[in-house]
Structures are given as C-alpha cells and as structure tokens.
Amino acid sequence: PLMLYAMGQTHALAQLQATHTIAMVGSRNPTPQGQINARDFARNLSASGLTIVSGLALGIDGAAHEGALLGAVMRNAAPTQLPTVAVVGTGLDRVYPRQHRDLAHQIAQQGLILSEYPLGTPPLRANFPKRNRLISGLSQATLVVEAALPSGSLITAKQALEQGRDVLAIPGSIHATQSKGCHWLIKQGAKLVESAQDVLEELQLPVWS
C-alpha cells in the first residue's frame, strides 16, 4: 500500500521484518474445537517467540489474537517483541466488530494494529478481502485453522503462495463443513500440521518446551 497507518507499539514496527511471524486465519463461525485450536496454537507459537498476524475478525482471528497475548505472558516478552499484529479493514478509529473493542485495546497496548485505510473509513465489505494480502505479506507462512468452501481464508492462502510464503493447514473431521477448506488446501500441497511443534519444524525454528 502507499500508506500504512499504525497504532500501538509503533516503536517495534521497524523490527517486524526481522521477526518470525505467522498469519493465522480461518472461519468467522468456527467449531468449538476450531476455536480451541486457534487459541492453543497461537499461545504456544507466541510463547516460542513468533508474532501472530491476523485480522481481528470474529471466530478464528479473535481466538488467535487472544492466544498470542497469553503466549506473550508465558514467555515474558520484551517490550520490543510483538505478540500479535491485527491488520484491519477499517480506519484505526473504528473497531470492527464491536465485540472486539476490548481485544483491540489489549492488542494496541501490547502489539500493533495496522490499516491501509485512513481514519474514518467504515467497515466496507470490499476492504476485508483486500487487507488479506497484507496479513499474508507480513508473515513467513499462513496457517489456516478452519475454513469452509468457499472461504476468505483461502484467498489469504492463495495470496501467501503468490508472495512465496508457505501455507499450512490443520485437518479436521471429514464430515465437518468448516474443515473442507483445510482439506482442499492439503490436497493442493499445503503442509498438514497437528501441533504448534509441527509449525515450528516446518519453519525450521527451535521447538519450545
């Protein structure tokens, strides 16, 4: 983008490109297990030193941000280490969805909120798919936690591949609608991961214990 607006720990923005980062995306209407997986993966990856990038949406995004903040507590993160980055599709003065107002405040206190849209920009439907390229572009890899067919998360995965990033996916039940997108990605060559340790190994990073 021509311009990027930032709110939060902006002093750490310059170090973001040198930080190990992973995008975590998925359904806005996840299964209970998907919600748990997102939070647990994010917590353990954050505790291992990774920055979790997501989009502050309901469902998987929110759970990933929450897990990342918990993981930062576990590793006693230094002020220059960002636990999580939220890339939003509105102006920074608009929190969307409203249910994530408190979460957005926590992210601004400990991490970063980024937007390519100027202040005052409302939550326009077209903006959210556009911001997905920033979520994947800021990350070494994209992890799809749960996704139906079709899904905006698959757009993010496609953009990650176009940007030369790895795509990882968590499998689920063959009967679960919210796992069909992940299964499709795995068939297309995405790396199947069952734990945070699997993710670290795929990224060739030390396994946290």
Model-predicted segments: where are they?
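Glycine-biased, small-residue-rich flexible motifs in mid-sequence functional cores and linkers
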Residues: 1-209
